Amino acid sequence: MKTKEFKLKKDKVPYNKKPEKISFKEWQIALRKQFALDQKFKIKNSGEHPVYSDFDVTNPTTQKTYKVAIRSNTIGYNFCSCPDFKVNNLGTCKHIEYVFAQLRSKKSNEKIFNTDYKPSYTSVTLKYGTERKIVLRIGSENNAAFKELATDFFDKQFFLKEDAINNFGVFIEKAHQLDPAFRCYPDALEFVIAEREKKRRHSIIEKNTLKAMMMFN
């Protein structure tokens, strides 16, 4: 989803009142972008790619360090281990926005941001936002084979089908057979496990309700 951009250096976004011309979500994202510009976090790239990589972001004041994973230029596909990111349903946070601001400030990264990035490996990730979804991102290695495998588990937009949750382990096993470099990120796996448990509990409730109804008939 594309969000409206503020020229933050010229137009300060008010913290105590939402501007009328934007939605609540756009306001909250803009606030985090604005706050990020004033920070002096320390960044360490713990991966291999200059942009699409894992970063350790440390606040020198609190000495707290969070992991930021930059996987896409599109909001919702990145990750941060901070508490705010886990609950805000925005798909971003001040740490992600700070990393993006620092990366975009380097002229050497300009071409990377203007080019579609496709890694060699295929991965399963969790798309964050108002609605969280499991998404398959197919890399360049064994591209055709992964697309064929995906048809039984993912829709045309490569979001996990609802009826494929219980068979997710089968997909993971076959994906690793296609390419040992295949990745399923921990937050995506945790989400699938949680969704399975919700379905299991719902099924138990339905069965118990049906039994109770039959007893009184």
What are these regions (language model features)?
Residues 1-217:
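Long, low-complexity, compositionally biased intrinsically disordered regions
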